[in-house]
């Protein structure tokens, strides 16, 4: 088994266990900072050793060195800045050398930081160097719109890991996972990173990698923060628990990684390799466009398809962990097998289903073949992404007579049925109600909204009924209500929400 990055597994929870009670007592009398969702992920991996050699949030010199050179000031390879960002108001209350209690949910004391640095980062430089500067990159948007403008650096002392209430048997620390590998005598382990559901091709890929390197398989999906719009981790874990059953006995283990991804492409791939090395893996599969967020609004890729593989390979001697390049696997129907594309003659018939096509089939309720994935996984994904006729929707009535039209639509929808609930939703003067709209849609409810919605409402299947040419359901101001209702029903039928 490989040594952790930097030579020592920095398990701060174990290190500080004897003084936990004293730290907890002290923390109750200290200034407090409530950790953000990203900071909770970061601090968990600092405290449990996943981010070894880090033992705290980066000070200014280490931060600038990582941003500019992908190295700590010690010279050790580290590609992603791990920082404690705070707002200016809080920063003004902090002094160098001060100790601050770090909390989860304003309630659970996680750690104490001794502040060694208070600094204002050059976010433009961070965006350019770490994420390549495209302002549409989700990490740059987070940096500019969400992250605090002041960073605090300092060493941490552990009180406890952030609290979790789900999948506790799968939340293995680096020390625990290394102990598992030692008990099972797994001295060669191929780690597989994913933030998506897994299908037959992924199983084939990982088994091939294991055979090729005489190793076992660690399925190590990310369950912290991933790309906006990704499938929720509860759905994905159901998929992972199902697919791990499909591996030969004793070859694969599933464990969860509480990582806040930055979607930083090649730099992130190096970071992922370091983390998996700390967790005890000896090999790491680096995928095509690994940790990339896809394309921007112009259709341009944020990263090249093989940038990650090239960068990780360039550091292979320092990393120690062996890189296993992801091979594109495809299905041969005539032989009922999966093979790497580079092993197939061009005349051989192959089949594949893209992510876009899979989402389309889920949305429309059409067949997803067994050669692509397992029926049990299809069922899990259909629960998350039901076909249109089971999905909720929102009709925004922007008209002179919104209540009359809304009542007519409600009566008609109730008559049609369709297996969903319907509701007239009036948020006028009650903006707090807007937060409920995404939940109604997710639950399959058909909402009829009688006031315009702000663009900040983040929900799928929102359609406007209006006199404007750009409206989804275009009507005229003088059109009879019965015709407006008919147009709306036809629109919903055309878009598969109703089946007659």
Curated annotation (Swiss-Prot):
Binding site for ATP: 193-196, 287-290, 329
Alphabetic keyword roster: Amino-acid biosynthesis, ATP-binding, Cysteine biosynthesis, Cytoplasm, Methionine biosynthesis, Nucleotide-binding, Nucleotidyltransferase, Transferase
Molecular function via GO: ATP binding; sulfate adenylyltransferase (ATP) activity
Region (Required for oligomerization): 391-500
Top-rank lineage group of the source organism: Eukaryota
GO CC list: cytoplasm
Pathway where this protein functions: Sulfur metabolism; hydrogen sulfide biosynthesis; sulfite from sulfate: step 1/3
Catalytic reaction equation(s): sulfate + ATP + H(+) = adenosine 5'-phosphosulfate + diphosphate
InterPro entries in UniProt: ATP-Sase_PUA-like_dom, P-loop_NTPase, PUA-like_sf, Rossmann-like_a/b/a_fold, Sulf_adenylyltr_euk, Sulf_AdTrans/APS_kinase, Sulfurylase_cat_dom, Sulphate_adenylyltransferase
Active site: 194-196
Residues given in the record as sulfate binding sites: 193, 195, 291
Enzyme Commission number: 2.7.7.4
GO annotation, biological process: cysteine biosynthetic process; hydrogen sulfide biosynthetic process; methionine biosynthetic process; sulfate assimilation, phosphoadenylyl sulfate reduction by phosphoadenylyl-sulfate reductase (thioredoxin)
Site (Induces change in substrate recognition on ATP binding): 326
UniProt xrefs under PANTHER family: SULFATE ADENYLYLTRANSFERASE
Domain writeup: The oligomerization domain is distantly related to APS kinases, but it is not functional and does not bind APS. It is required for oligomerization of the enzyme, although the oligomerization state has no effect on the catalytic activity of the enzyme.
Family: Belongs to the sulfate adenylyltransferase family.
NCBIfam families hit by this protein: sopT
Subunit structure: Homohexamer. Dimer of trimers.
Function: Catalyzes the first intracellular reaction of sulfate assimilation, forming adenosine-5'-phosphosulfate (APS) from inorganic sulfate and ATP. Plays an important role in sulfate activation as a component of the biosynthesis pathway of sulfur-containing amino acids.
Name assigned to this protein: Sulfate adenylyltransferase
Provenance organism: Eremothecium gossypii (strain ATCC 10895 / CBS 109.51 / FGSC 9923 / NRRL Y-1056) (Yeast)
